[in-house]
Amino acid sequence: IKTDNVPGKPEWFDALVNKVIVEGDDVTKKFATGERQSIHQKKLDDGSVVRVTEDVDDGAVRVEYESSENVFEDPVQLQYKKPLPDEGDPRPTAEFTTAESGPVGRAYGPDDFEIEVDEVGGRSIRDLDSDVSKLKEYATGQKPTMKEILQNKKRRDKAKAISEDAEAQSDAVIRRQGDYDPSPDDFASGGIARMLGE
């Protein structure tokens, strides 16, 4: 598989996809959710699992990375997608996206704010809190440099903290969404409460 160069896509993405297809097991019958999907899976040395899905119908190549060191121990997804050409868009542009589970802040009222686990992501592996260095190491066959080892350890520690510590979850929400501002301008005024004199 050869994919276009798109912003955010790591240079080792194609090597990873092709290596999993060649060395991994064909698990299409077990995991396919559509008719024209091809799915291969490879278990890495540390027990983590990499699954590559090629979906011909929507032009997507998806990599799912399952590791106990991911945020909330949930899978991380890297996806390259180039929509199929049609009359409205004869030359569609490809895009690369990432996704993982992460804390998300939701306001349900002026005094009601909750942190929930939901899918968060971006357009680059830099947008992930989980460490995906094992994927690069497997794809390229190269051991990480000392600088990369330190960066990867920081990332793993951060993922563990977010998974286990409420304060780290709050910090992650603020980093992604900004600080919570329950200003009264955001909520309705008047209505039945004003008519009742409250």
Over which residues does each language-model region extend?
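Short low-complexity linker/loop segments enriched in small residues
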Residues: 1-198
